[in-house]
Amino acid sequence: RGQTRGLGYDAYRFLAETLGPAAESTFVSAADLVQEYLDTRLPDEMPHYTAAVAVTEAIVTRALSNDVITPGTTTVGDVRRALYDMLGAAGVRTWFQPDLRVQRAAGEVATSRGFLAVAPESTVLMPGDVVHIDFGISYMGFDTDWQKMAYIMKPGERDAPAGLKAAMRNANALQDALMLRQGRPGRTGGTVFTGTMAEMKTQGIEAMIY
């Protein structure tokens, strides 16, 4: 599907300014063609796409469950191998390497390019850890992309700590600002980003969108 990746607004302006008005006047938008190509679906395809979503959800849910994770014993590498085993059992493949990231209370959080870094394969998952999985499958030309988080409860706990629940509410507030209020037709990506970040600032929430 590489042929469907078009120009962003900034790239368009760069080409127009670099090549000049004469060349810009010959530019023809392929947006309608690309959109029609991507939007065209046969009725018989839809059950398969629904199945792809269900398979992705089932694999990730099991990978984050006690079926796979034994706190104090299971490593990041073990979970990754379990993901690949479940892919094989389901007869599907992934379109990128599944990543796991781990946040640990009172522990130094490694970052990469400003984001939480992928955890080493040897990292042992412990009670109190927050585990993040980035995972997706490819099936009949359709790619899923799941990002899920789980909290490994400590002995005696029956629910996630209040602080983690507050963090989830903040994340939901960011989602609402981005998808319900700022992300409207006719706006550039930069405008949506700036508006969303400004809204988060007024709510006292430190946020980032990528």
Language-model region placement:
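Active-site neighborhoods and metal-handling regions in enzymes and metal-associated proteins
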Residues: 1-210
